[in-house]
């Protein structure tokens, strides 16, 4: 249920944290800071170190051919999933899905998203229901929006929610609203003892799910 967002630059730091918390997480999400700072090879290193699936959070948003070229390299490097924007349209999204599993962004939580992305949430949900990605991204800081998206999304499509922890989102509230995976970064990797931080969240989630 817990996805660790490793938004750090340093390879050694990323590998150390990942190994430290692997017992309490389900997947690892790498973003541009780590890929730029350490190279694509860090994806396979993380998989080898932890045995966990890797999400490449590239937020791809280009024409089909460019999306395809980028995605091929990232999947070849060992990524299990790629996150991409929906607003570029079906052709660009499908170009990536032809190569591997995808996670589509249907809504974001930052203020700027209200201008262009969030007004199209319903269209993005319809697109996801048609294309059948592994999952979609929904704002973990807004349980009411998680619930809205979950109710309109095919049951076989997972809901992943960033913004848990440092940004104010509650792990249990996100799960109650319909999230399948909660994405947590700073609350774990910036903690004085990342393993203990991950364990605490894991136990909180486990206690709720066993009720």
From Swiss-Prot:
Gene Ontology terms, MF aspect: orotidine-5'-phosphate decarboxylase activity
Active site positions, chain numbering: 59 (proton donor)
Coiled coil ranges: none
GO CC, one annotated term: cytosol
EC number: 4.1.1.23
Any Pfam family the entry gives: OMPdecase
Record-listed substrate binding positions: 7, 29, 57-66, 109, 162-172, 185-186
Family, similarity comment: Belongs to the OMP decarboxylase family. Type 1 subfamily.
Matches recorded under NCBIfam families: PRK13813.1, pyrF
Biological role stated in the UniProt entry: Catalyzes the decarboxylation of orotidine 5'-monophosphate (OMP) to uridine 5'-monophosphate (UMP).
PANTHER family: OROTIDINE 5'-PHOSPHATE DECARBOXYLASE
Subunit: Homodimer.
Protein name: Orotidine 5'-phosphate decarboxylase
Native organism: Pyrococcus furiosus (strain ATCC 43587 / DSM 3638 / JCM 8422 / Vc1)
């Amino acid at each position: 249920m817990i996805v660790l967002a490793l938004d750090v630059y340093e390879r050694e730091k990323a590998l150390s944290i990942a190994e430290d918390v692997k017992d309490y997480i389900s997947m690892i999400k790498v973003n541009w800071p780590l890929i730029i700072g350490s190279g694509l090879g860090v994806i396979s290193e993380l998989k080898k170190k932890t045995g966990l699936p890797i999400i490449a959070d590239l937020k791809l948003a280009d024409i089909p051919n460019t999306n395809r070229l980028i995605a091929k390299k990232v999947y070849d490097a060992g990524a299990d999933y790629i996150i991409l924007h929906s607003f570029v349209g079906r052709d660009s999204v499908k170009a990536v899905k032809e190569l591997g599993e995808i996670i589509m962004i249907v809504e974001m939580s930052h203020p700027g998203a209200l201008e262009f992305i969030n007004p199209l949430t319903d269209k993005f949900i319809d697109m996801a229901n048609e294309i059948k990605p592994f999952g979609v991204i929904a704002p973990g800081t807004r349980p009411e929006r998680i619930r809205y998206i979950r109710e309109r999304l095919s049951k076989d499509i997972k809901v992943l929610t960033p913004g848990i922890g440092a940004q104010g989102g509650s792990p249990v509230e996100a799960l109650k609203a319909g999230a399948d995976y909660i994405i947590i970064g700073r609350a774990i990797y910036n903690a004085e003892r990342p393993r203990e931080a991950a364990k605490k969240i894991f136990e909180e989630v486990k206690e709720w799910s066993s009720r």
